[in-house]
Amino acid sequence: MKLERVSSNGSFKRGRDIQSLESPCTRPLKKMSPSPSFTSLKMEKPFKDIVRKYGGHLHQSSYNPGSSKVELVRPDLSLKTDQSFLQSSVQTTPNKKSCNEYLSTPEATPLKNTATENAWATSRVVSASSLSIVTPTEIKNILVDEFSELKLGQPLTAQHQRSHAVFEIPEIVENIIKMIVSLESANIPKERPCLRRNPQSYEHSLLMYKDEERAKKAWSAAQQLRDPPLVGHKEKKQGALFSCMMVNRLWLNVTRPFLFKSLHFKSVHNFKEFLRTSQETTQVMRPSHFILHKLHQVTQPDIERLSRMECQNLKWLEFYVCPRITPPLSWFDNLHKLEKLIIPGNKNIDDNFLLRLSQSIPNLKHLVLRACDNVSDSGVVCIALNCPKLKTFNIGRHRRGNLITSVSLVALGKYTQVETVGFAGCDVDDAGIWEFARLNGKNVERLSLNSCRLLTDYSLPILFALNSFPNLAVLEIRNLDKITDVRHFVKYNLWKKSLDAPILIEACERITKLIDQEENRVKRINSLVALKDMTAWVNADDEIENNVD
């Protein structure tokens, strides 16, 4: 064998074996290692089928002694697609027998006999022999077979669907928000209205309802109110306006002004968070409702922190059982539209406070100062003089009733047209009731005089007999020890029933018994009178016949 060294462009190529003419034997075979260019070919047949077709090596033409040139017969390695092969299923795993199948060495590659190269080439042949053509359909079938046991659920991804075009019109969105705000007004925390007072005993309940089943139910409810069960705090969901703000940017911009129009809190934590966020924002709040419901831990400095809240549009201000706070003095100049002020159970409210406040609330219609023990006649007179539109006034109390006398009642009757009056526990006497009935009796619809210890039979019973309160619907006269004559109450009530306008008389157990006895007596008298009239009518025919005879 003869070695030739060939140089081209200044570089030496590797020696190439030239087979002599005297050597008729074929070249030795070696394992073929696929090059990157070879493996990158998109073969149209599996590599192992090519190997099997040519018997594991490249065939060479037989030696021709008359020829001076060696002719190497190259196998036909054209990569044509076999249609029958594409239609059949593809064998993805290599055949183990193909590990020992070899290809002949190309011409330009020298013989390699080292053990390391042989081991490397063997592994490469295995990988190369596994090359095959896989169509997308076959890949899908293979994946389906391999993953058939897996059960995948639907992905929990939010589907962003475009809303209807009508919900992108600002005017329509604003009308929707207004409707939601009107519905949300029912969730404003407020004192539950009491249809009837709780009975003082089971016998009292029987006298009130005159039905055993209803009496038991009312008495059971009264007992539960006295000893309420311990109920765990339940965190409520966000309101409807919060959900509207999360729809999109348009709904957010439309909802935000409505969010600050009605501010009501019954959780100290929520109110503290509101104070914190209100100081971080630059937006000015102009609410029409501001209500705090039973926030015992809120103090006056907390209220003073509401520097960005303006009260020009405020119509309803309520601090229900918030004993430590009062409306700041800085609010007084902007309360001209205030119509409803409810501050019960607050010892910080006194005459000086009412004197300064009354000058800024000319449109006030409802004022509740129940259990504000430091208010006297002076403060009530200031309210009566400066609030002519007043319709509801309640200053009932359990302590220090001597501070409120008939002076306050007469002032309200003279300067206002109040319809609901609450003077429970105050020192109102007969003269004050007479004067009030003369001045404003025709406008009164509800009158509460519970525990007014100075009232006697010379005031209310006679006023009812004279129909001094023609539009009265509810009368509360509990714990009036000096009231013993209830005849006019019963007659007035029966007369109202005949007009389909009955009056509700809320009385204590003693007065209720007197009223019940008087009603039975009146019914007996009416029955006797009716029987007497019927007897006279029946006997009238006999007398006529006797006179004719």
UniProtKB/Swiss-Prot annotation:
Main location: cytoplasm
Name by which UniProt lists this protein: Antagonist of mitotic exit network protein 1
Task of the protein: Negative regulator of the mitotic exit network (MEN), required for multiple cell cycle checkpoints. Acts in the daughter cell to inhibit the mitotic exit pathway once MEN has executed its function. Through its binding ability to TEM1, interferes with the TEM1-CDC5 association, required for CDC5 kinase activation and MEN activation. Required for daughter cell separation and chromosome stability. Involved in copper sensitivity.
Note: Present with 2020 molecules/cell in log phase SD medium.
One biological process term in Gene Ontology: mitotic spindle orientation checkpoint signaling
Protein localization: Cytoplasm; Nucleus
Biased composition, class Polar residues, residue ranges: 1-11
CDD domains, per database record: AMN1
Matches recorded under PANTHER family: PARTNER OF PAIRED, ISOFORM B-RELATED
GO molecular function: small GTPase binding
Keyword presence, Cytoplasm: yes
Region (Disordered): 1-39
GO cellular component, one term: nucleus
Transmembrane segments: none
Keywords: Cell cycle, Cell division, Cytoplasm, Mitosis, Nucleus
UniProt xrefs under InterPro entries: Leu-rich_rpt_Cys-con_subtyp, LRR_dom_sf
Induction notes from the record: Expressed in daughter cells after execution of mitotic exit. Expression is controlled by the ACE2 and SWI5 transcription factors.
Domain of life of the native organism: Eukaryota
Family: Belongs to the AMN1 family.
Kinase keyword on record: no
Subunit structure: Interacts with TEM1.
Organism this protein belongs to: Saccharomyces cerevisiae (strain ATCC 204508 / S288c) (Baker's yeast)
SUPFAM superfamilies tied to this protein: RNI-like
